[in-house]
Amino acid sequence: MRGGAVTIHVKDRQIVAPGEFVGEQGRFRVEGQVFRVGRKYYSKVLGVVTVDEENRVVKVIPLKGKYFPVEGHIVVGKVVDIGFTSWEVDINSPYVAVLPVSEVTSRPVTISRNELSRILDVGDLILAKIVSFDLSKDPVLTIKESRLGKIPRGTLVEIPPQKVPRVIGRRGSMVSMIEDLLGVKLIVGQNGRIVVVGDDPQRVEIAVLAVRKIEAEAHTTGLTDRIKQFIEERLRS
């Protein structure tokens, strides 16, 4: 919903519950998941508030289906902008993450957008770790640790973050089974993003379909056996 100008009664990055008071008609324009009663606006959803002081816009973004950052989590991110000393990274969250140059390379780098774009460009996918986050500042990422870094190729699949544990399986059993049966690699982010890497397009497609099946049936029992049967049937057909 897009409303008229409001006087806001919430802070930037504040988490709001359904029915929580956001603001009333005044200086700011209200957008997103809100409803109006008289002159007052309330949140429709469990969401996070963003306040754009420059453009005088307050917005409620739903948290459902989005990833809430946690320090130590491994995430699949997409570079969306390049600054002078860092990259902005979409991590499937209401909060845009920051990847500083110091968390990418230890070698001296000429600080310029052109130089940074040679390391990571807009649209590149990365596997990164969240090293810090609180509600007062954006998540900070690193890719300096082993197995982290740019993901050069693969097919991106997005699922609700809460269903990622079912894709991984107990002690990684589900991921290992899919990889072994299909000869592919699954790069799994705790933010609901999975990259399927493989040389055979048909097997990559089967892996994607298997992930979608896990997503749809995550609440059921006996899922590992059904996924194995599903893959074996697809390979025979």
Curated annotation (Swiss-Prot):
Q: PROSITE patterns, alphabetically?
A: KH_TYPE_1, S1
Q: Which GO terms describe its molecular function?
A: poly(A) binding
KH domain boundaries: 152-211
Q: Could you provide one GO biological process annotation from this protein's UniProt record? A: poly(A)-dependent snoRNA 3'-end processing
> Does the keyword Membrane feature in the UniProt annotation?
no
Keyword RNA-binding set for record: yes
| Cellular component annotations (GO), alphabetically ordered | cytoplasm; exosome (RNase complex)
Q: Which InterPro entries match?
A: Exosome_RNA_bind1/RRP40/RRP4 (IPR026699), KH_dom (IPR004087), KH_dom_type_1 (IPR004088), KH_dom_type_1_sf (IPR036612), NA-bd_OB-fold (IPR012340), Rrp4 (IPR023474), RRP4_N (IPR054371), RRP4_S1 (IPR048565)
Family from the record? Belongs to the RRP4 family.
Q: Which NCBIfam families match?
A: PRK04163.1-1 (NF003181)
Q: What interactions and quaternary structure are annotated?
A: Component of the archaeal exosome complex. Forms a trimer of Rrp4 and/or Csl4 subunits. The trimer associates with a hexameric ring-like arrangement composed of 3 Rrp41-Rrp42 heterodimers.
- What is the protein's name according to its record? Exosome complex component Rrp4
